[in-house]
Amino acid sequence: MAQMSQAGDLTSGPMLKKIILFSLPLAASSFLQLLFNAADVVVVGRFAGSAALAAVGSNGALINLLVNLFVGLALGANVVAARCYGAKDDQGVHETVQTAVTLSLVGGVLMAVVGFFAAHGLLELMSSPEDVIDLATLYLKIYFIGMPMTMLYNFNASLLRAVGDTRRPLVCLAVAGVINVVLNLVFVIVFQMSVAGVALATILSQTVSAIMVTVLLVREEGAMHLDLRHLGIHKKAMLQIIQIGLPAGLQSTVFSLSNVVIQSAINSFGSTVVAGNSAASNLEGFIYTGMNAFAQAAVTFTSQNVGARRYDNLDRVMRNCLLCVTVVGLFLGCGAYFGGEVLLHFYSTDEAVVAAGLSRMQIICTAYFLCGIMDTLASCLRGRGYSVIPMIVSLVGSCLLRLVWIATIFRMFRSTGTLYISYPISWALTAGVHLICLLVVRKKMNDQLKEESRLAA
């Protein structure tokens, strides 16, 4: 098998510069993915009414809950491929590629079937408002039909990121993003398809991005080449992906579960609050993706350096990623805080909806950097091969805390503000425990390296 290129080497050179160059296209890609959702929300809110806006928005937490397990497996593929790449294990990289793509297709089909047939029942469990549940069900069913393509893109983009390539997935999303916006306008304004048109535009554009990124892997030479004729599961690669990815997916699912519970509580305030919350959440997503690019950089850089046994780089990776995520989080969060009212008017002209969205942004935006710190510390742990620890910490620090909060504090002080404040509290507590765990793991790995050096002497 042809030798791997060193173009994606993340183990040497100026680390901060490499992290920024890696993260910028990744952040841009995430922004484009958010523009898919923003285009949905803006077009629907402007041209189909607040009921349609609430129908689309009420699906967000549920969709995340159902897909995050497989997104976690995509992260597992990223960690395993990056570690093999850092160790210059060509065979390991190739087997990871073949296995990851196969898992994405199997998982995507599974999610499509489950999501399509369970859509209405799941929305009922979430107490979706009666005036929007039929529209929400229609949107959700169409969305899940495209799930195989969504999963295929996520896995393939993760594989490319593992070897330092964040630019070409950006191009794929840029093309798909233009298609999504055009189709949104055509389906909703011209053909009056409302939420069905929005969902259809989304899955068609995601199909384009999935096909494009798959072609990139097929055209790769050497270890990263995707051989579509020999797709299959390699046991060792699958077990490693599951070992890292399953806990990561469960962690994301835990967060989504708590968000579903909070969304259910928000639904109880009616469609106006649901619509405002949807618009604000969409705006906050832009802050999150700006930070999350550095969290994803942390896991890829850490994984490659662990594979190359360059433990001396791990502290630099952690410090630089934490610095970047804090600066970006504060800058974007404060910008959204002060410009919230203007930004929300892009989503709706209904002043009651804008006011409802503003009440959320005023609480969450300035503290959002805590979420970035939490994710970056968890990524550093996963990159070092410890994925169960952040899962357990998140289970207790986020899901359990938020559930207890809703069952106690929210019952005593029933308001949207009481719900929203649970987010920054859980971020701060979870980040603190992640940091303690990371320091313990860091000491363990350094002691192990010293022992190996002593034995080799």
Model-derived features: where do they sit?
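Short alpha-helical transmembrane segments in multi-pass integral membrane proteins
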Residues: 1-23, 81-146, 179, 190-246, ...
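Residue-level signal for short hydrophobic patches within transmembrane helices
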Residues: 12, 16-35, 39, 62-69, ...
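Helix-terminus/linker motif at the lipid-water interface of multi-pass membrane proteins
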Residues: 31, 35-54, 123-130, 186-193, ...
